[in-house]
């Protein structure tokens, strides 16, 4: 069916539509033409394995001295290669944490080492107490001014503050103190260190997407006087090997996208397969989850099309029938749907049918749950469309009831579960029960998005958003509403951090997915720009992630 055939009925009826005029894709070529050979990946793996044994020996040798051990573990984490030695690292950190009272009593560590120890333990779930930083305060309860002479120690303290939980006032004070002085110190430092400081001030390590942070740290580490050549080579080999895997996955995704032909059939929607894959790789970073990344990216692309249909093209009556059809989700959609919606409906139907047929991975019951998430998402999208159609601005709480669903966290978590064989109904039940870490991730997904509402969305008029509802509820300005919502997000990070601390009943794979979803939401909408829609903002990140290898 030609494009004109799908959309002509609406044109003939002269239906008034809001057209968002999304920017075209930034990618003028298909990644399907850039598929690497399997032999290339195997060659990288062999070379990596040779160096891996040397790095493992270094890790085991570092146990003799705590400062050396914690610095080496930190390097492994920040260079993106700690997953190779996960069991060894957990064993070492567990031993340190158990012995921590004695260690702190017998040693007077520097600001740099103490903050590094604090951050590394906390990022692995060990809740080291924050009162260890009282030693850096003067008799007036203020942080000592002499600390500003230790630039690396100050930067390490700054990074440590982002792992705080509620009630840790000293870390809130430390954040304000370090941020103020680091902004000045960046001007006085060497270009090498200044760039590292500015990257941290823009997006701290704990909040940054892992692959972006890893790339930045490899570049920084290469310029360090204390750089270990073997460790640097290992990190670069690992980065380049994963890059080949990511490029292969993006090539397969490009073929799928070409086959379903959505941009020709539905030209009003965003063509963002590369950006969708960047999200998948930013959230699901471990190499063994290739299938999960592809599942996630495909679901994200289809949900983007649905979102554009609800927000930017469909009429209210069309959306009403489309939502009802999705609630039934049978083979034949209702005849009341226009042709373009029937096409979209059939794409969704066929996609879920193909997933459900994959019995070898035991997906049938998981696909059923994901289908229910799709129905819930459609109801949420329609509720927002109904408010707009009726000229109703809901309260902030009413909006968030549906807005947390339209954050898409639940839907994308279910897509992730579909791609991981070891995850089953137990994890879906966890998601359905709405634990704190999931609620927090949804809060971030919704509020970050609404802070970065595009100008074309603003032109649509009183389309509800969290910002507008909050302004109306509290009779405050746009600036004040954003300030208050950013405070909610700061508190949300503390909630998230608390959920990461041991003991926890949540499997690590789920906490990692949740926090990486938050990191990608933060990165995508930081600065008030929707980098997913405005693809220029993500282009360099994607190139570095998938195209340009690091020189070894």
Curated annotation (Swiss-Prot):
Its cofactor is Mg(2+). One of its GO terms (molecular function) is sesquiterpene synthase activity. Coiled coil: none annotated. Mg(2+) 2 binds at residues 307, 311. The keyword Lyase applies. One of its GO terms (biological process) is diterpenoid biosynthetic process. Transmembrane segments: none annotated. Mg(2+) 3 binds at residue 457. Binds 3 Mg(2+) ions per subunit. A motif (DDXXD motif) lies at residues 307-311. Its EC number is 4.2.3.-. Pfam families: Terpene_synth, Terpene_synth_C. The Asp-Asp-Xaa-Xaa-Asp/Glu (DDXXD/E) motif is important for the catalytic activity, presumably through binding to Mg(2+). Belongs to the terpene synthase family. This is Terpene synthase 5. The lineage of its organism: Eukaryota, Viridiplantae, Streptophyta, Embryophyta, Tracheophyta. The gene is TPS5.
């Amino acid at each position: 069916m030609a494009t004109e055939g799908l959309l002509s009925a609406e044109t003939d009826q002269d239906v008034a539509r809001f057209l968002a005029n999304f920017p075209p894709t930034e990618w003028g070529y298909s990644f399907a033409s850039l598929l690497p050979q399997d032999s290339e990946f195997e060659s990288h793996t062999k070379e990596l394995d040779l160096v891996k044994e040397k790095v493992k020996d270094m890790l085991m040798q570092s146990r003799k001295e705590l400062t050396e051990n914690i610095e080496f573990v930190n390097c492994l984490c920040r260079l993106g290669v700690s997953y190779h030695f996960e069991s060894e690292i957990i064993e070492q950190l567990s031993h340190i944490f158990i012995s921590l009272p004695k260690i702190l009593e017998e040693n007077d560590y520097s600001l740099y080492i103490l903050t590094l120890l604090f951050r590394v333990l906390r990022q692995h779930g060990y809740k080291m107490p924050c009162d260890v930083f009282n030693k850096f305060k003067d008799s007036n309860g203020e942080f000592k001014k002499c600390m500003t002479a230790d630039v690396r120690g100050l930067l390490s303290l700054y990074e440590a503050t982002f792992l705080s939980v509620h009630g840790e006032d000293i870390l809130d004070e430390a954040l304000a103190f370090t941020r103020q002085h680091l902004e000045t110190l960046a001007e006085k430092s060497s270009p090498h260190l200044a760039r590292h400081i500015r990257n941290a001030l823009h997006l701290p390590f704990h909040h940054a997407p892992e692959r972006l942070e890893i790339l930045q740290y490899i570049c920084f580490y290469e310029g360090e006087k204390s750089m270990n050549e073997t460790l640097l080579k290992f990190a670069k080999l690992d980065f380049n090997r994963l890059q080949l895997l990511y490029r292969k996955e993006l090539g397969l995704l490009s073929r799928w996208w070409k086959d379903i032909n959505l941009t020709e059939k539905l030209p009003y929607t965003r063509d963002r397969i590369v950006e969708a894959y960047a999200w998948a790789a930013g959230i699901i970073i471990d190499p063994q989850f290739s299938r999960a990344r592809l599942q996630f990216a495909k679901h994200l692309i289809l949900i983007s099309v649905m979102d554009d249909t609800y927000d930017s093209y469909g009429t209210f009556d069309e959306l009403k029938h489309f939502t009802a059809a999705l609630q039934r989700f049978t083979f034949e959609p209702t005849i009341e749907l226009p042709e373009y919606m029937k096409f979209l409906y059939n794409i969704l139907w066929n996609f879920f049918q193909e997933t459900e047929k994959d019995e070898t991975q035991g997906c049938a019951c998981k696909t059923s749950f994901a289908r229910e998430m799709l129905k819930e998402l459609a109801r949420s999208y329609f509720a927002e469309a109904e408010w707009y159609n009726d000229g109703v601005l809901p309260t902030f709480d009413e909006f968030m009831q549906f807005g947390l669903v339209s954050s898409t966290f639940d839907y994308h978590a279910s897509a992730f579960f579909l791609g991981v064989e070891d995850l089953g109904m137990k994890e879906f039940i966890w998601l359905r029960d709405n634990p704190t870490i999931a609620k927090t991730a949804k809060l971030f997904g919704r509020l970050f998005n609404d802070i970065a509402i595009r100008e074309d969305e603003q032109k649509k008029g009183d389309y509800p958003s969290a910002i507008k509802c909050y302004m109306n509820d509290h009779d405050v300005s746009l600036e004040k509403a954003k300030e208050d919502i950013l405070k909610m997000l700061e508190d949300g990070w503390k909630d998230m951090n608390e959920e990461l601390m041991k003991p926890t009943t949540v499997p690590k794979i789920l906490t990692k997915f949740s926090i990486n979803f938050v990191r990608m939401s933060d990165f995508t909408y930081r600065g008030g720009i929707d980098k997913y829609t405005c693809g220029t903002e993500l282009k360099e990140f994607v190139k570095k992630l998938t195209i340009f290898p690091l020189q070894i």
